[in-house]
């Protein structure tokens, strides 16, 4: 039947023929079950449904005095697909993905901070009150800024994306500065009570730079000596050339006896 294989659909007919031909002694026990509930014979594959991104906003509509919750549907561009890509699974998108991409594009070094990747249900952010950025039991990170911005967009009337981003970033910078000050004060208090710390990151960097400079200086000295030796091989050693010049000057000054 061309490129279609109907062997699985005709398993009952095959079993009946084998039993009639004597290849199997007794019919299989599932023979009547397959007769009552036959396999599906749908050969047409349905295309996966395309879902749209729905966003919740609080807006003051014209003619109303109080803000209302409005659900907006983001218009999705309909792009022609190739036949080979028509039945691919639908891409799952959330509004947080765009906010997360924008934040980490502006703050790439936040990805270098250690993070806790253990989650219980994958919805840990729903267990916090994002009316404030700092949460008890959770470290301050980029995900906090994303959830705080999303909360502002969903609950503050007439809030724009850029304004929510500015508010969340301002709170984030203030808390990061507070953490830095607390860290410095704790280090100063520990040093005042006799604690000793190793070299700082700046001191470690300077030491590595000094080691690299000394290594380069030794290499440059050796290269200079090799270059001098190559030059002397063609023109003679500088000491020999100076001695020859002195002999020539003496010969010119002292008259040769006749």
Swiss-Prot record:
Coiled coil feature spans: none
Any Pfam family the entry gives: MRP-S25
Compartmental location: Mitochondrion
Keyword match Ribonucleoprotein: yes
Highest taxon in the source lineage: Eukaryota
GO cellular component labels: mitochondrial small ribosomal subunit
Keywords assigned: Mitochondrion, Ribonucleoprotein, Ribosomal protein
One MF term in the entry's GO annotations: structural constituent of ribosome
InterPro entries xrefs: Ribosomal_mS23_fun
Principal subcellular localization: mitochondrion
UniProt family annotation: Belongs to the mitochondrion-specific ribosomal protein mS23 family.
Subunit structure: Component of the mitochondrial small ribosomal subunit.
Entry protein name: Small ribosomal subunit protein mS23
Protein's organism: Aspergillus fumigatus (strain CBS 144.89 / FGSC A1163 / CEA10)
